[in-house]
Amino acid sequence: MGKSILDGRQALRKEIDKIAEVAGYLWQNGWAERNGGNITVNITEFVDDAIKALPAISEVRPIGETLPHLKGQYFFCKGTGKRMRDLARWPMDNGSVIRILDDCASYVIIADHAVQPTSELPSHLAVHDRQIELGSGYKATVHTHPIELVAMSHNNHFLGKDVLTKILWSMIPETKAFCPLGLGVVPYQLPGSVKLAHDTLSELEDYDVVLWEKHGVFAKGTDVMDAFDQIDVLSKSAKIYLDCKAMGYEPTGMSDEQMAEMSRAFNLPR
């Protein structure tokens, strides 16, 4: 077995283990069929001088746009065509560490293997670029296909601004507490398209989690577990709603007054 970038770097290993753990949850929840979904995490804070000196193990690859705040940043990215269930067991065989070059428009792979990152890397990196610009502290992006949330996106009634947010908040107090910005919605666009990436970036100005109509969700978080937790909580609310409907009744949900009380009690932004 060859040497890994994780050897002797416990903090970095712990971060990659966290990514692997979340990949396992995505698979176990049925949200990551075949090679569905992506994870990209900014690991620059764990990079030492020895890592900075590592040579490239790939050719220089274009990002597709210039992202001025990513100069010299390092990311762990799930590989294109790789499965979450495999990422959960063998993260360094199913993802790679990349370095953004000084032109802010290209990158190289530096470890462990020359696993080509996801084709959705440009859209993930654009979100990371914006988070650094804002100084938000967000380090992780996750794209996955939560069953109940995608199912609800097939009904146009739910796609108006904050319609789903209000419904999901009202199903269980934790949703409003732990997803206080709610759920943004991006109308259907071709997967992997520039339009989808731009619309997602715009919607993430106001939300931490965005629903892609008839496709999946895209979330940003302080780390990969934070991004997962928000998706998980929203999905629980969606399941409660759909279970109520399956039992033949419309759930009453928490009242506006009860949700306002939550906002006051926990100093929530909305």
Protein language model features and the residues they cover:
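Glycine-rich flexible loops
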Residues: 1-270
